[in-house]
Amino acid sequence: GKRLRSAVTKKQKARSDMRVYSATNIGMKRKMNQDYVFASQTPVGNLPNLFAVADGMGGHNAGDYASSHAVRILVDEIREDTDYNPVKVIRHAIETANTEIIEQAQKDEKLRGMGTTMVVATIVGQYAYVANVGDSRLYVADKQLRQVTRDHSLVQEMVRMGEITAEEARN
């Protein structure tokens, strides 16, 4: 839908000496970590590599299921896609994962309310193609840590519109 279109894939200059790290933290409020990470520095479908992080929501097993299942759908869709345009490939895979998660949540009462954020990247030549939905973030570290994605959240939208400051959003 409309929110997904706002997750337009970005093209960023990439370095060839790339190292990939992932870290998740359950935080102090949650009892279960609903994060799911996928990283492949070898080809996935027509993409030369693929990196994805999803953070589920929806309580108990539903959020955990949403994040892991969404990434599995994403990877399967990318493997089967015959297009070579990374923007189209990633967008189609995210849209498919989104549709399937919504449909499953509607069919199964135990999964009602589930959802997931997602950030996806692929490095093609000198460029990184990045897409995100929700508030899962992608950072690049090169002497300093730099956030590449912009959160899709009510608070971030309030900051963008000038209704609150970034400092107020952090507190």
What is the predicted role of each segment?
Residues 1-171:
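PP2C/PPM-type serine/threonine phosphatase catalytic domain
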